[in-house]
Every structure is written in C-alpha cells, then in structure tokens.
C-alpha cells in the first residue's frame, strides 16, 4: 500500500511539475512578445495629437489652385514640384505636432492619418483624368480617391520618402517607401478606407490588376 501511495504522489508531482513548466513557458513567450512590442514602440512611436484640417488651414492662402490632368506624368511631377514649398511646410507641421521625436515612420503614419481622418471622400460622378491640386484639396477639405492619393504622395515626398500612385480599375491610392524601414518596400496608403491602418489595403482592391506611377 505504501508503495502504491508513493507512486501516486510521484505521478501527482510529475503532473504539477509539467504544468508549472508549461505555465512558465507561456509566461516567457508572453513577456518576449511584450518586450518586442515595447522595443518597436520605442524605435517607432505612434503619432499622437495629429492636427486638424482647421489648424493646417491657417498655413494656406484662400485662393484655389487650378486642376490638372492625372495621366500626363510630367504635369503631375511639375504640380508637385511647384507646390513643394507649401506642402513641405504643412508636412513638417503635421509631423512635428504628431511625433515627439524625429522618427520617419511615425511621421509617415501621421501624414496618412491626417489625410484619412481630415479629408472627406467626395466621389466624382465618373472616374476621369482630372485631378485637383493638392493645395486645393487642403483648402476645400474634400477629395476623390485620386486627389487623396496625390496629396498623400506629395506630403510623403516632402519629408524625404519615395512615393507613387497606384491605379486599379475605377480607383487610385498612394504607396510610400521609407528609408531603412522594412527593406524600403512599398507600403499602401488607402486614405478612402477609414478603417484601414497604415499599410493596409481592402481585399477587394488588393486582388486587382495595378498600374504604378512613381512621382
């Protein structure tokens, strides 16, 4: 009987020991992921207090700019170049207000959140090849998908990132490439999707054939 009792105690001990090891392993894994998240946050903090359109509007003149064609590459680049100084001032203001340190990833996210949250989506009656000047979009506060894409691309370029436009049937959005971040891969900026986070793209758009236009 004593031998059987000792064996039962041994089995219970082994079960408790295995359970303790399992709990310790789960705890260690959880702590590891928490430490990784904390490290990433310290490396690339999230934007806070992204300014409103009303605040940014104080930096703009009242006069609206002329629209231009979106399918003439030289004209798109020229318009962005001509508005660079104004756009750079606005981009720097948004970046400085939103990020406590000069982190390019945080600043890029702040610019995306500003356009996504502050610019209202106003669809065209038909998808055509005319775009509003990015300064006009900031002044009116409304834009279709093409206009939002050009504005975002201009803002991202103003802080030193690469940017390009992506066209799919009936829609357009922007992409950004940030130096020394994720292998400088192209990240999606879909500002018309109010639920999309930085880099995300709705599935119905992700599967479509795309034409890319770096600016």
Could you describe each region identified by the protein language model?
Residues 2-215:
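A structural boundary/capping signal
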């Amino acid at each position: 009987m004593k031998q059987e009792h000792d064996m039962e105690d041994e089995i219970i001990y082994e079960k408790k020991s295995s359970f303790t090891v399992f709990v310790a392993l789960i705890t260690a894994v959880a702590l590891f992921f928490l430490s990784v998240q904390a490290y990433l946050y310290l490396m690339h903090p999230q934007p806070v207090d992204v300014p409103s359109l009303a605040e940014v509007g104080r930096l703009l003149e009242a006069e609206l700019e002329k629209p231009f064609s979106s399918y003439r590459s030289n004209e798109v680049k020229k318009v962005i170049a001509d508005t660079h100084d104004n756009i750079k001032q606005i981009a720097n203001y948004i970046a400085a207000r939103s990020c406590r340190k000069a982190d390019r990833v945080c600043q890029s996210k702040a610019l995306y959140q500003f356009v996504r949250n502050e610019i209202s989506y106003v669809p065209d009656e038909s998808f055509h090849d005319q775009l509003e000047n990015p300064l006009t979009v900031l002044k009116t506060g409304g834009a279709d998908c093409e206009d939002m894409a050009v504005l975002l691309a201009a803002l991202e370029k103003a802080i030193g990132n690469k940017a390009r436009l992506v066209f799919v049937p009936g829609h357009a959005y922007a992409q950004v490439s940030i130096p020394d971040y994720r292998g400088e891969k192209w990240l999606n900026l879909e500002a018309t999707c109010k639920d999309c986070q930085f880099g995300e793209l709705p599935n119905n758009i992700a599967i479509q054939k795309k034409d890319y236009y770096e600016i």
